[in-house]
Amino acid sequence: MKALILVGGFGTRLRPLTLSWPKPLVEFCNKAMILHQIEALVKAGVKDIVLAVNYRPEVMVSVLKKTEEEFGINIHFSVETEPLGTAGPLALAREILGKDDSPFFVLNSDVTCVYPFEAFRDFHIAHKCEGSIMVTKVAEPSAYGVVVTKPNSTVIDRFVEKPVEFVGNRINAGIYIFNPSVLDRIELRPTSIEKEIFPAIAADQQLHSFDLQGFWMDVGQPKDFLAGTCLYLSHLTSQHSPLLTDPSQNKWVYGGNVMVDPSAEIDPTAVIGPNVVIGPDAKIGPGVRLQRCVIMSNATVRDHSWIANSIVGWNSTVGRWTRVENITVLGDDVTIKDELYVNGASVLPHKSISTSITEPRIVM
């Protein structure tokens, strides 16, 4: 099988992290976001993966070369000279996606879930229609586009954008399977798969919905990145995953859902958790309190500091007796001096902060 991952452009929603790395290479729970998806696709038998990119493809090529060799797959880079939306990239990659009669996956690179690609593939093959959309249930469907199926059927009847009245609670999860025939519907121009292609396939009664079981989150912006981290860690806990740090062996773990890279240095008087990820070679000092946060590789949190609901970027340093909270995001190589309060700041790379930031703002 084949797959196309919609990588897209500048990743502006996840700045300042994406000022240093393309969004798919930003670590989500200590692994590049795109590697979570590639590994799951390989398990479903995918051999050819197309990455539709229009920002810094050369960085991704060098990083993912090892991934190709490790999994014995072919990773193709389809580079857009202009943004082509969510459907145009399929036309651009027609030569690979349409090279045989087998169906292909399409997925948004921002989505994290359990990735049930094998079950999704089997569902698609069984109904013998042109396309399948993975859907997930949400509590507030009025904020999304809702997928409405025919009664007692998986056949999609229509799509309702941000409904005022309740018509259903299933939304597009950003993961699809198509037969190559769908390529005949798509021109090589900026095109929306959601607004232009899906309604046409649904009108022909050739589009089905597949219910995603378990968690789902679009992690393309900081608050959702943190929420998705919590969901993913909770999933690992439910699976008794060895990727999580064992509280019985590490007394500084509090409340569970903690993932710490083995190379990180944690002072035994620190209190970490719940819902914390600490990356490679990070250093956590005495008396530090971490909760619902991500500390990326080579970052340092000095003595008696408190970090909650925030992301500390690569190579950054948080000084002693400092409080960081409220969706603060520190870019690469940021320094926060001692005894400061940082509230909801987005700090661009290589900045040094020497005064408190009491209200959310961007520090350039």
UniProtKB/Swiss-Prot annotation:
Keywords: Cell cycle, Cytoplasm, GTP-binding, Nucleotide-binding, Nucleotidyltransferase, Transferase. GO terms for molecular function: GTP binding; mannose-1-phosphate guanylyltransferase (GTP) activity. It is an enzyme of class 2 (transferase). InterPro entries: GMPPB_C, GMPPB_N, Hexapep_transf_CS, Mannose-1P_guanyltransferase, NTP_transferase_dom, Nucleotide-diphossugar_trans. Pfam families: GMPPB_C, NTP_transferase. Pathway: Nucleotide-sugar biosynthesis; GDP-alpha-D-mannose biosynthesis; GDP-alpha-D-mannose from alpha-D-mannose 1-phosphate (GTP route): step 1/1. It comes from the Eukaryota. Gene3D superfamilies: Hexapeptide repeat proteins, Spore Coat Polysaccharide Biosynthesis Protein SpsA, Chain A. Its EC number is 2.7.7.13. It catalyses: alpha-D-mannose 1-phosphate + GTP + H(+) = GDP-alpha-D-mannose + diphosphate. It is found in: Cytoplasm. Its main location: cytoplasm. SUPFAM superfamilies: Nucleotide-diphospho-sugar transferases. Belongs to the transferase hexapeptide repeat family. This is Mannose-1-phosphate guanyltransferase.
